[in-house]
């Protein structure tokens, strides 16, 4: 892809928050270049907040450049204080090392199928652990002005809170990230660092340190922080983060998350997250606005993102579960799909045995009293495993795979019961 076309596309998608000299950057990227993005290990899985920078690396690779994914085995031991209200809890070296391995594996498994050339994977612990304290302060620390560092908005916010402040440990984080850029520039000729807009101060420090240590000019580009139209952070639900690991967030729940995006956000998210062209997205929006009924944008977004993260099989599974719940054909689900619902798709209770339906409705919270439970049954409002139910008894042989009952009240209230295995 032509360099100008690449940056024009990023701008049209709203993916450029801040950048160093844009004309210089466009000129530089007329030739193949190397860029990187860092990912600190704060858990054993990435979440959807990491998707935009990972997808950004792919956008550059599709244009003929080389992306580097840096896992912060060293910086993850410290914790980035940028715009955090309080000090991060420090994790043990063993925990961080396990997370580093998990993230590296996850990034490779997620991204490699979508790339003609895999991302280069690096761990900043590989170079940081060999630097002595004295050498670090002499060779790197001397290039940083405390006066300038305390003027950063992210630091000023913490200093303004006497109940929190900022420790020397977190205050020094910027030095470590800056040295990463200088190191990658020296070893991989890396010319650009990308990151969230909260990383702008750290990126600028890295640009300055690289110039001082290596005598080269490098660049930075930040992505917008993803928020919903109401100003709240995107990517969290009442149940917590939306993880990319299927064992933490099932493909079904992942699919449903995107399917439930607000109309005010969905077209912006199609630009951020998908590889549909801007023209295609504009056409989707125009079609949705012209027709009466549910817009197609949420379905398209959910399909694109679930396919990208969980593959065709994950998408098809999520769609089968969604269709089965809608149609009542729950006996069409396989055991793995029922386990997805057990994991996070439906409220699930584990019971030793089930024979009394009134008790079942009380246990699942679908009825608040025995009287109400009987009324629901008499009125035909209850379905069990897709079948309308008005009896007060239930045989275990009716359980799906001898384990599961999916109980439905009305059109939208669902609960699941798993029979405890003897």
UniProtKB/Swiss-Prot annotation:
Entry annotated with the keyword Amino-acid biosynthesis: no
Annotated ATP binding sites: 236
Catalytic reactions on record: tRNA(Tyr) + L-tyrosine + ATP = L-tyrosyl-tRNA(Tyr) + AMP + diphosphate + H(+)
CDD domains (UniProt xref): S4, TyrRS_core
Residues annotated for L-tyrosine binding in this entry: 36, 173, 177
A GO cellular component annotation in the UniProt record: cytosol
PANTHER family the record matches: TYROSINE--TRNA LIGASE, MITOCHONDRIAL, TYROSYL-TRNA SYNTHETASE
Record-given protein name: Tyrosine--tRNA ligase 1
Lineage summary: Bacteria, Pseudomonadati, Pseudomonadota, Gammaproteobacteria, Vibrionales
Gene transcribed to yield this protein: tyrS1
